[in-house]
Amino acid sequence: MKQVIAARTDIGMGQGKLAAQVAHASLNAYEYTDDRAVRRWKDEGQTKVVVKVGSERELYERSEEAKRAGLPTGLISDAGRTQLEPGTPTALAIGPAPDADVDQITGDLSLF
């Protein structure tokens, strides 16, 4: 079991902004995960992996692919209070879910 969080590289987020957006996405997807999967994920150490996506379009494509596969997702758009325009999509979490299921959607992405 793992969760993969994809963050955009094309919008110039600072390190703090990146960390916050990844955290928001992780928690958002977690909230939509069934209790049994959450227990298993926690028992296995709550693995989280952060990867790169190069565009808004790619973020949305991965989100739709995960939804079609029945995986929990959390797609985050920034509030626009600091670095980004309001509503800018920043990060997508997929899972927690079985490793192989998440890897089908994110396995080709580079680590952050």
From Swiss-Prot:
GO terms for biological process: translation. Coiled coil: none annotated. It is found in: Cytoplasm. It comes from the Archaea. Gene3D superfamilies: Bit1 (3.40.1490.10). The natural substrate for this enzyme may be peptidyl-tRNAs which drop off the ribosome during protein synthesis. NCBIfam families: arch_pth2, PRK04322.1. This is Peptidyl-tRNA hydrolase. It comes from Halobacterium salinarum (strain ATCC 700922 / JCM 11081 / NRC-1) (Halobacterium halobium). The lineage of its organism: Archaea, Methanobacteriati, Methanobacteriota, Stenosarchaea group, Halobacteria. The gene is pth.
